[in-house]
Amino acid sequence: MTATPWSARFEAGLHPTVAAFNASIGFDIELIEYDLSGSAAHARMLAHSGILSEAEAEALVGGLEQIRSEWRTGQFRPGLEQEDVHYAVERRLVELVGEVGKKLHTARSRNDQVGTDLRLWLRERIDRIVGRLGVFQRTLLDLAACHVETLIPGYTHLQRAQPVSLAHHLLAYIEMGERDIERLTQIRERVNVCPLGSGALAGTVLPIDRHYTARLLGFVALSENSLDAVSDRDYVVEFLAAASLIAVHLSRLSEEIILWASQEFRFLTLTDRCATGSSLMPQKKNPDVPELVRGKTGRIFGHLMGMLTVLKGLPLAYNKDLQEDKEGIFDAARSVESSLEAMTILMAEGIVFQPDRLAGAVEEDFSNATDAADYLVRKGVPFREAYGVIGAVVKHCLKSNALLRDLPIAQWRHFHPAFDDDLYAAITPRTVVAARNSYGGTGFEQVRAALGRAEARWQGHFPSASAH
């Protein structure tokens, strides 16, 4: 490990194993672009406040931009002997601009520096993930628009319950995605707060202008308390919670695709573009994409639980434990982005619904039983009485190996005299679905209206995409 800015206080060098354990350069290098931007803004603020000369600030900013260029072209790759990204950048800066490079850290601590870097990084990642969500939502909207009148069994307890429009089913996931976008947008507001200038924990005696730095970096507000500013990782937890919910929603859809692609359901087939085979069984076509998305969900949950556990016992202010915030959030963001991208491709070109199988599926069960009860309700029969009547009818059908449509009207009247020939039209799957026309229901008119509202919301979130 090379000498560090704090080594003057110590007589003995750090044990190599401890140095390696202490170092974060192996993962916090991901923050380098944001560290460079934050440092450049800090240098400009120091000159603006009269702490550095304009010439000194220009030298610092020029050196930082040189490091950025070297990083992007692969010329600058800090080794593992560096403690962290901040020291690696500072050391290279001194090599490039000389002694003035040592002035960059004036009125700044790594504590407020890393908080600034992480917020800048997360702000950009949130924007990227919201963009990915937008593309995913667009794919679901387009798919749903093609299947307003395609019927599919609806389930509760994984038992067939009532038939629904396939578009209505897909709209449920669009609603989940809408909440995900709203959550991330709200979290971004709390991320977009500048802690730079808080120092190690107590601020600084130098006449800095924190508002100036915040404006340069695009922050909309300043942190109000220096102790809280350097130790706050609420925004990390919030992001990990939001990422976990996105993963939950993708995992639920993945589970359904896995089920629907199975021989037991056969509601859809997987295309060759989004499936894999078996190394042993030549007939297999495996749903690897949704399985991996489902698997990554547990890993994202783990990062959330890990961060909560790190924070639960920390006294104010900064503690080294907070170094553990980065690997989890970096991995969670990557996992969510890759899952959204893969699921978008899967929904766009990886599945083909089987309309004949779906049409048959809604005809072969008792999912129209509730509508038979509603038929009696419309005839003036109390619902609880109607419920009992239809329960008895279903029990009779099960013993007779018949469906509701198979019973002659005379048998229906044996159970209740209010039944008439118009019953059969009332319990066909298409009639059953179309009749559920309450707001938010699966009736075709309601589904078309819901698609219109979802489309309007999508265009509100992504106006530039809507223009193309």
Swiss-Prot record:
EC number, UniProt record: 4.3.2.1
Major location category of this protein: cytoplasm
InterPro entries membership: Arg_succ_lyase_C (IPR029419), Argininosuccinate_lyase (IPR009049), Fumarase/histidase_N (IPR024083), Fumarate_lyase_CS (IPR020557), Fumarate_lyase_fam (IPR000362), Fumarate_lyase_N (IPR022761), L-Aspartase-like (IPR008948)
UniProt-listed SUPFAM superfamilies: L-aspartase-like
One Pfam entry name: ASL_C2
Gene Ontology annotations of biological process type: arginine biosynthetic process via ornithine; L-arginine biosynthetic process
Keywords: Amino-acid biosynthesis, Arginine biosynthesis, Cytoplasm, Lyase
Subcellular location: Cytoplasm
Keyword Lyase: yes
Keyword match Cytoplasm: yes
Disulfide bonds: none
UniProt superkingdom: Bacteria
Gene Ontology cellular component annotations, sorted alphabetically: cytosol
PANTHER family: ARGININOSUCCINATE LYASE
Family as reported in the entry's similarity comment: Belongs to the lyase 1 family. Argininosuccinate lyase subfamily.
Descriptive protein name: Argininosuccinate lyase
Lineage: Bacteria, Bacillati, Cyanobacteriota, Cyanophyceae, Gloeobacterales
Encoding gene, per UniProt annotation: argH
